[in-house]
Amino acid sequence: MAETPEPHKDNVSRRQARDPRLDVFRGLGMFIILIAHVPNSSLSSWIPARFGFSDATEIFVFCSGAASALAFGAAFDHHGWWWGTRRIARRIWEVYRAHVGVFIAVIATLGLAEALLPGADYLRDRMNLGPFLDAPGLMLAQFLRFAYVPNYFDILPMYIVILALVPVMMALGQRSPWLAAAFSLTLWLGATTHLIELNAEPWSERPWFFNPFAWQLVFFTGFAFTRGWLPAPPRRRGLLLLSLAFLAVSAPVSCHYGFSCYAGWGYAPMLGDIHDWLDPVIDKPHFGALRYVHFLALAYVSFILAGERG
């Protein structure tokens, strides 16, 4: 009888069970992000960002961290660090190609729209791509090496940098989860205090909108829970009440223009002043500390509501 061929190593981690809950919440996060970027949408008054410091971005990045632990963890566990790093490198290359492809597709699509619609100025006005149009060859070279990260094209570069940190975190975590946590927190501290920055364009000091060294904290929080480096939180009434209280208190001061920002419910100057005072710790590009606390509180409430099998 012929021997059954051994499964190819590339297929091992792909066979790990997918958690449909992650796909659901990532899809929900993407849908909310879409609503947030639709101009003049009445639905944008009701997205999570209007009622708290964190928003759908945290949901998406956290779930991406958990999904990455499922997708790549087995490669590191069963075949070693180098094989796992190879899998990560392959994924980075896939995401990089998608990043370049989407940019070219957007340029082509909006360029065609401008040619067909007199007076339309999507590329310069809406997308702020004037520098690319003025020097396409130079800017394309800068774009390919992440020295030029235009508006709306910063999500995938952030994801690529965070993915590149996975082998480092795995090496540390396999020795001690505390080492991985210390490394992640140190990176976050450097980024959230503006000590670690990446420039988004060569002619100014504008940083990437999403600092990957700050946002890796929420990514690796999801990663750590899925890997088992972090235990499931205890189900305690006091902790639930504390989380609910924090969510309730943060809602009125979550936006510059008062409660719910753009809902047209009136502007309260005092709430706006409090928001401005809190800005260093709720800053989105550098993932301020209160954004993290708010997300953890929201996640804990969701965890409790989901029940024992949640």
Task: Please state what every model-predicted region is.
Residues A2-G310:
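Alpha-helical transmembrane segments and their immediate juxtamembrane cytosolic regions
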